[in-house]
Amino acid sequence: MRTDFFQFFSYFCRKMAKQTLVIETAKELSLNDGMIAITDRDTGEIELRSLEDVQMVMIDNHSARMTVPLITKLVANNVSIVYCDETHMPVSMMMDLESNTLQSKRFQNQLAASVPTNKQLWRQIVEAKIRNQSLLLEKLGKGKNLLMQYYDNVKSGDSTNREGIAAKVYWRKLMGKDFIRDRYGEPPNSMLNYGYTVLRSMMSRSLMNAGLLPTVGIFHRNCYDAFPLADDMMEPYRPYVDRKVLDLMEDGVTEVCKQSKKALLELFFNDIPANAMLMSASTLAGVYEGKGKIVVFPKIC
């Protein structure tokens, strides 16, 4: 029944799917009669975009500019603003701090969550991640139910590290025995980094929309990590990025470039079920409120 509701919810929300506006050249963004005005600073040409059609603005050019009135309007309309560095990797994000009317109460519930509750939540997250990794390998013809032995043995808090053990098998089967998943490693690691960073931004936005604090994690608790809860909740979604990177590699693309950035951004509107991350965040908030025990994550298809 929960799966049926999730499918209906995803279908309904897809009808209202929004887009990411990516600025890659020297343009100025301003507010014009309630619309986003995008002015080419070289030609003076102006393009207008409706605020209602945009859920994220990504600034990927250090010469681009945005006016304060537009920034204020964007965050008031729950549009995230993401800034990229000189390597085109997203490095910072601006979001509305009052995106949910139940925010204060949900913050309190989240902070009051017991250790056993968080351990059970982490078990669910790890199970969902391993399940999607296993499904992806099966769909790619790289092994049926290969990781399910680890899925079936995840304990509270993943005390036996089934996630790490499954990951070793997963990457070897997915990318080949010579591949090493390393943030600073050789291609296609940079594309994985880019996709995961965008995923993290999208999950942070969904958590804020659900009235949760992305800064308070379930498992990730590094004091230098700004969004540990997003890092926790994005785990079951990583295989979506992995599959898109594989598709790009089949097309001969191995590094972050215009083609790979476009494909990885479109992933969040074409491949991942619409509003799936908001559903995951909302059901997590429900667990903290005592209204349920299950966090909903989509199955990769």
How would you name each of these model-derived features?
Residues M1-K15:
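N-terminal amphipathic/basic-hydrophobic helices that include classical n-h-c signal peptides
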Residues C13-S50:
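N- or domain-start disorder-to-order transition segments that initiate the globular core
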Residues L29, S50, S63-T67, K119, ...:
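Generic structural signal for well-ordered secondary structure
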Residues I38, E45, M56-M58, M66, ...:
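A broad, structure-centric signal for solvent-exposed, well-ordered loop/edge residues
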Residues L48-L51, R181-R183:
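A short alpha-helix capping/helix-coil boundary motif
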